[in-house]
């Protein structure tokens, strides 16, 4: 188990992580018609205020483990879409991550009055993690006939 560090995302982190995304994350992006690299670079395209993107790296090798953040919706910078995309390196460091991730969620929450996102029902581990974090789920939605 390696120590994990968090720093502000730079585009190179996105280029590093995109080809190594977990298959469940690639699947979920595909449901929305998104390419992994485009999705990871999306926060850099926004000119809105209150955009946050952070990278989790292994301390020893500086390997990108995950990228996460929140982006405000178009007409209200206090309502955000939260997201988290990771590589298989997260599994190797999952307990370390779990013990330290709540402070980053609290940081994102401080910047918004409401955070939301959509998740596929196949993403069971993330659903458990989100519930553990205190997120509430609404009724299922049909997306593009999937």
Which ranges hold each PLM region?
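A conserved beta-strand-loop-helix scaffold within acyl/acetyltransferase catalytic domains
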Residues: 68-77
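Conserved beta-strand-loop-alpha-helix junction that forms the acyl-donor binding cleft
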Residues: 115-131, 136, 142-145
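Conserved beta-hairpin
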Residues: 50-69
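A short beta-loop-alpha structural element at the N-terminal edge
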Residues: 2-19, 25, 30
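Active-site rim helix/loop that mediates acceptor-substrate recognition in acyltransferases
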Residues: 30-51
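Short active-site oxyanion
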Residues: 3, 113-116
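Conserved acetyl-CoA-binding loop-helix of GNAT-fold acetyltransferases
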Residues: 93-107, 128, 132
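Conserved acetyl-CoA binding element of GNAT-fold acetyltransferases
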Residues: 77-92, 96-97
């Amino acid at each position: 188990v390696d120590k994990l560090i968090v720093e502000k995302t730079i585009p190179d982190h996105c280029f590093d992580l995109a080809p190594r995304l977990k298959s469940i994350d690639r699947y979920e992006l595909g449901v929305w018609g998104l390419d992994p690299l485009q999705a990871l670079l999306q926060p850099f395209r926004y000119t809105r205020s209150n955009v946050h993107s952070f990278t989790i790296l292994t301390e020893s090798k500086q390997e990108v483990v995950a990228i996460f953040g929140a982006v405000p919706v178009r007409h209200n910078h206090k309502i955000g879409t939260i997201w988290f995309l990771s590589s298989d390196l997260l599994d190797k460091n999952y307990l370390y991550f779990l013990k330290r991730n709540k402070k980053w969620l609290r940081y994102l929450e401080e910047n918004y009055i409401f955070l939301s996102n959509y998740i596929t029902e196949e993403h069971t581990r993330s659903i458990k993690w989100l519930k553990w974090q205190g997120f509430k789920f609404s009724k299922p939605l049909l997306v593009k006939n999937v």
